[in-house]
Amino acid sequence: MDYAGRWNRVHRLAVAACLGGCLGGAVAADDAGFERLFDGTSLAGWQANENPASWQVRDGAIVCHGPRSHLFYVGPDAAKPAEFKNFHLKAEVKTRPRANSGLFIHTRPQPDGWPAHGYEVQVNNSQGDPVRTGSLYNVVKNFAAPAEDDTWFTLEVMVVGKAVTVRVDGRVLYEFVEPEGVTGTRKLSAGTFALQAHDPGSEVHYRNIRVKRLP
């Protein structure tokens, strides 16, 4: 997805000692405190905008394949969409070859177009856009795919205050700390999640989507 960004502070962590207590505890094997956002059988709690046919449930996964569309998590009451501020999100993801998708955080439902609020965590292991899976689009650019196509991998996103931490298969890719004074709508605030169907040539699967609210 193409849009402009203005950012100037990224912390890349080779050894995430400072995250050991915080993120390490949150990724405990028992998943205590996590709530499931996807029931594995339907799109209940989710709302697609333009081109809703780009979404289906297949073999226990949400599959995006078709023209541009975004699937917003709204929760049990679409009139009052669910909202998250500090959280730890986990999802299992599988990309097909040359597929592009994304996971939006702190966003808001809208009828069409690229989401105007929040950040996009890129999902792309081999498509023409060189910005690969895990990148915070137009903010933190990762050019080495951390996972392979046609293989399930675990994507984790944690937001605490102004810090965004992304992991793939248990490995910390980076911590981004948003600078003070950011204006506009592409910033951390609060909001919901959205999945992206990028284009008709892209197919990506999502399953076991769950979140834990953090203080």
Write out the residue ranges for each language-model feature.
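Bacterial N-terminal signal peptides that target proteins for export
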Residues: 2-15
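Bacterial N-terminal signal peptides
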Residues: 14-24
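Carbohydrate-interacting regions of secretory-pathway proteins
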Residues: 27-215
